[in-house]
Amino acid sequence: MSHQAHAYHMVDPSPWPLTGAGAALLMTSGLAMWFHKNSCILMTLGLILMLLTMYQWWRDIVREGTFLGHHTSPVQQGLRYGMILFIISEVCFFAGFFWAFYHASLAPTPELGLTWPPTGINPLNPFEVPLLNTAVLLASGVSVTWAHHSITEKNRTETTQALTLTVLLGLYFTALQIMEYYETPFTMADGVYGSTFFVATGFHGLHVIIGSLFLLTCLLRHLQYHFTSKHHFGFEAAAWYWHFVDVVWLFLYISIYWWGS
């Protein structure tokens, strides 16, 4: 290998972009097969290949940043910009769902009974499970901030406690959301209310699961001494993502659960 006279990481040849693209092709083709042929085999294969690709690719990134020292300050700065742009793209993603909700709710059409919620829809009580979910996510936001301060102060014990608590709160939120879905008196097929409710809250729930896995990975890396008080961007990215999930939930709660009911 030739001498590298700069601080930027030149990525080694990797098969994971190719396997990731193949997994995406299998999953999208499998989704069409599931819809039209009622067969999940192709989508399951794509999902397995995608999970294996994610594991191997992220393992390589951890190895490069933690053990090989490739994540210099300029590289970390680039990763920060990348994470910020990713979160901005997620904001745009959820903005579409809120647009659909407010487009339907602010000017209900005659098909909806000129009222919101539409005629025949019994919305959930915003002061029961949704309010508990709000408290759970806000508490998890506090605990992940506690974990961040503990890392910067080199307090391993409190970092472990705070990260464990955050992951448990994320799992508790997911369990409450599943229970709520089972108890809803309407379905996704019940017009624009049902579709906007389940798509918006469902994608948020998916992001909570992803964020919980992100933080669980950070906890396992922390237990193996991968983070220092100065070098812990993997955790920072997870914390940013988690705070983003918290903020989205507050907008969902105020818009769909409270105002929309």
Curated annotation (Swiss-Prot):
Matches recorded under CDD domains: Cyt_c_Oxidase_III (cd01665)
Claim: Ribonucleoprotein is one of the keywords in the record: no
Assigned EC number: 7.1.1.9
InterPro entries: Cyt_c/ubiquinol_Oxase_su3 (IPR024791), Cyt_c_oxase_su3_dom (IPR033945), Cyt_c_oxidase-like_su3 (IPR000298), Cyt_c_oxidase_su3-like_sf (IPR035973), Cyt_c_oxidase_su3_a-hlx (IPR013833)
Annotated membrane topology: Multi-pass membrane protein
Sorted UniProt keywords: Membrane, Mitochondrion, Mitochondrion inner membrane, Translocase, Transmembrane, Transmembrane helix
Similarity annotation: Belongs to the cytochrome c oxidase subunit 3 family.
Cellular location(s): Mitochondrion inner membrane
Organism annotation: Petromyzon marinus (Sea lamprey)
GO molecular function, one term: cytochrome-c oxidase activity
Name under which the protein is recorded: Cytochrome c oxidase subunit 3
Mitochondrial intermembrane side: 35-40, 106-128, 184-190, 257-261
Cited function: Component of the cytochrome c oxidase, the last enzyme in the mitochondrial electron transport chain which drives oxidative phosphorylation. The respiratory chain contains 3 multisubunit complexes succinate dehydrogenase (complex II, CII), ubiquinol-cytochrome c oxidoreductase (cytochrome b-c1 complex, complex III, CIII) and cytochrome c oxidase (complex IV, CIV), that cooperate to transfer electrons derived from NADH and succinate to molecular oxygen, creating an electrochemical gradient over the inner membrane that drives transmembrane transport and the ATP synthase.
